[in-house]
């Protein structure tokens, strides 16, 4: 006999969990569509050569890579952005530019499994391809804010930085292995200051004084300063080199655009330590954390990548986008008790007291569905206790009972499973009026 078990870092979803996830994905999809983003799909499995060039050394260690039955070198996608680059290169002539897309799908990384972190997880990506305008960067942040608010999340912070600022800091301190240094800096939250110092010393051949001065600059944060105060405080850095100057100027322009969009200034702050470990980022980058739940990590991250298609096409296309980590958000929303705990999407359960009443019950159920109310018929004619127990377990809001009197008079008796209220022999229209009073629960 085989023991039923699930691999570490992977999980089954029971109906309640799957319903919760579907509801959240539906809400963010509506937000994406409201901004004009259109859906696309790409395969879970790609040629390894498609995925590997843009993966950091850490990500490469986590990629599920193997030979398929045709002896081809293939890998499971680790994000949705690299497949997007391949997709755009293949189809750009028919897509039209600029191109705004969203994609929702599972990705795979062999990282250490822990709370809120899985080896298979769902990403919700939205990207603006084919424009270098900072208006696009501002819109991506606007979509992040709208998406989190659609999920009833208000207490969060988007930490913003610019890769040119980090490149400029590395240039100022004479760091030659810039990508490696930034990959290590990106692990500041994960391995701490001492861990980063050790890795920089080992991997980038930097002396301790240089490392300490570099990390002191990398840890510059806006914190409670106003935007104007912060930009005044860091103005001197623009004289260090062109990278720092360009990065800070872009952030100043971005803040003007976000101000025009009237996004609350409490929701976004500059943090020079935000690096994003993926090597394809070239411009503004951001990570979003929930205040009071920092240990969960980033729930939405992204940035600008101005060499999106360089590995696949001579025609270079810029892009900017972000990815919502829906699985981490489910963990957070569950702890905050903001999730629907029902194990059904049907609002009404119809129970029959006799086999001959099923034809009437099915007609009632179909009429309810046509009125926009999800309904199901309990499949057995039994004592009322069993369907009531079933409804309590699943989370139906109402049970409609069809007994002899209801069958003869073509009415139904209705019980609200939340309040305990029971009304007998109602007409369909009256029952519909009562059931429909709480349509927001559908």
UniProtKB/Swiss-Prot annotation:
Assigned EC number: 6.1.1.21
CDD domains, alphabetized: HisRS-like_core, HisRS_anticodon
Organism: Helicobacter pylori (strain Shi470)
UniProt subcellular location: Cytoplasm
Protein name: Histidine--tRNA ligase
Keyword Nucleotide-binding (UniProt): yes
UniProt entry keywords in alphabetical sequence: Aminoacyl-tRNA synthetase, ATP-binding, Cytoplasm, Ligase, Nucleotide-binding, Protein biosynthesis
The UniProt record lists the keyword Cytoplasm: yes
Segments traversing the membrane: none
Subunit structure: Homodimer.
Gene label: hisS
């Amino acid at each position: 006999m085989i023991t039923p078990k699930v691999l570490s870092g992977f999980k089954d979803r029971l109906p309640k969990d799957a319903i919760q996830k579907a509801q959240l994905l539906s809400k963010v999809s509506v937000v994406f569509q409201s901004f004009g983003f259109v859906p696309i799909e790409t395969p879970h499995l790609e040629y390894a050569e498609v995925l590997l060039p843009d993966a950091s050394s850490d990500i490469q260690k986590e990629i599920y890579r193997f030979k398929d039955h045709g002896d081809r070198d293939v890998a499971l996608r680790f994000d949705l952005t690299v497949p997007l680059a391949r997709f755009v290169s293949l189809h750009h002539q028919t897509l039209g530019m600029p191109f705004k897309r969203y994609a929702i799908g599972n990705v795979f990384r062999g990282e250490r499994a822990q709370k809120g972190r899985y080896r298979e997880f769902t990403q919700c990506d939205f990207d603006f391809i084919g424009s270098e305008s900072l208006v696009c960067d501002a819109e991506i942040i606007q979509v992040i804010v709208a998406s989190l608010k659609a999920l009833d999340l208000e207490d969060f912070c988007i930490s913003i930085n610019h890769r040119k600022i980090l490149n400029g800091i590395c240039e100022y301190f004479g760091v030659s292995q810039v990508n490696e240094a930034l990959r290590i800096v990106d692990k500041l939250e994960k391995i701490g200051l001492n861990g980063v110092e050790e890795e920089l010393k080992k991997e980038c051949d930097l002396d301790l004084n240089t490392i300490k001065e570099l990390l002191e600059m990398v840890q510059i944060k806006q914190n409670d300063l106003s935007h104007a105060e912060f930009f005044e405080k860091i103005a001197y850095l623009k004289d260090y080199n062109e990278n720092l100057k360009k990065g800070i100027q872009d952030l100043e322009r971005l803040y003007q655009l976000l101000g025009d969009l009237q996004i609350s200034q409490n929701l976004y702050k500059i943090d020079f330590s935000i690096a994003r470990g993926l090597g394809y980022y070239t411009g503004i980058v951001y990570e979003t954390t929930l205040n009071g739940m920092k240990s969960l990590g980033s729930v939405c991250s992204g940035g600008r990548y101005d060499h999106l298609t360089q590995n696949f096409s001579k025609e270079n296309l810029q892009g900017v986008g972000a990815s919502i980590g829906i699985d981490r958000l489910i963990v957070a929303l569950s702890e905050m008790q903001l999730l629907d705990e029902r194990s059904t999407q049907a609002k009404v359960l119809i129970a029959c007291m006799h086999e001959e009443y099923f034809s009437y019950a099915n007609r009632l159920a179909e009429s309810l569905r046509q009125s926009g109310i999800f309904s199901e018929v309990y499949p057995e004619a039994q004592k009322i206790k069993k369907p009531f127990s079933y409804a309590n377990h699943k989370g139906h809001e109402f049970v409609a009972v069809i007994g002899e009197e209801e069958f003869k008079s073509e009415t139904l008796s209705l019980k609200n499973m939340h309040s305990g209220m029971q009304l007998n022999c109602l007409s369909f229209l009256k029952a519909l009026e009562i059931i429909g009073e709480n349509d927001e629960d559908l």
